[in-house]
Amino acid sequence: MMSTDKFLVPGNEEQKISSVVFEAPMSEAKSTAEQNQLYERQPWQKLVLIFLAELFGTAFLMFFGCMGLVPKYPGGELGEYSGAIAFAGIVAVTIVIIGRISDCHINPCVTLCALLLGKLPILTAIIYFVAEVLGAIIGYGILVVISPYNILNSPDSGVCVTSPVVGLTAWQALLIEAITTGVLILLVCSVWDPKSGNGDCGSLKFLVMIFLTSVVVGPFTGNSLNPARSLAPAIYNNSWNMHWIYWVGPFSGTITSTLFYKYIIMALDNEERVK
């Protein structure tokens, strides 16, 4: 049986999640150690918190992000930056809400990065992955339910579906998604790196990153950078044209950037790195 002490909350593994508790005085028969246990969460409780945080976080991402791409009426035009603002904004807000619980991955690529960096054991990474996929499906599903049928529920609506623009080849789209996701993952690694000096204002950094890539890359590939984000709309709209691009591209970019940061940037002499 695998030891449960391998299941750690990301970030500071020693950090305890505490709360204010009001209760009657303890019996003197209870030892100090027994009292302290009341304020500590067991490993399985940490995993449940992580699962729920990622589930709700990814659902928020899909619900609010994709809502920014829903027209007011069939065939209606969207604001030029409505999708970029919606996705960038909800990413920043979600980081603030669940960041202290799960590091706010809400993206299987970020979870893969954490796994490759040694921040997560593989079973915990699987829990992240399942929560992210389910959360994306639930979040987009709620959006489908509350939207007018003639706008989002029609078979050909295609709202929030990621697909390459006409004229872009599969390999071009693949490279765009790989490179852009790679840049995102370099930012993730930098924020997690204790010697980079970039641990503060993480939500603002990712807000700028998502907004920038949405504006620049969105017109070409939809700026997925997240397999779960592309999977949910594909399921509901039964749209699988070149869908593989949004798995192979982001994951290949993630692996390349994570290994580059781990074995090249982090391997530099400590004196040459920002303290």
Sequence positions of predicted segments:
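Membrane-interface helix-loop junctions and terminal tails of multi-pass membrane proteins
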Residues: M2-K275
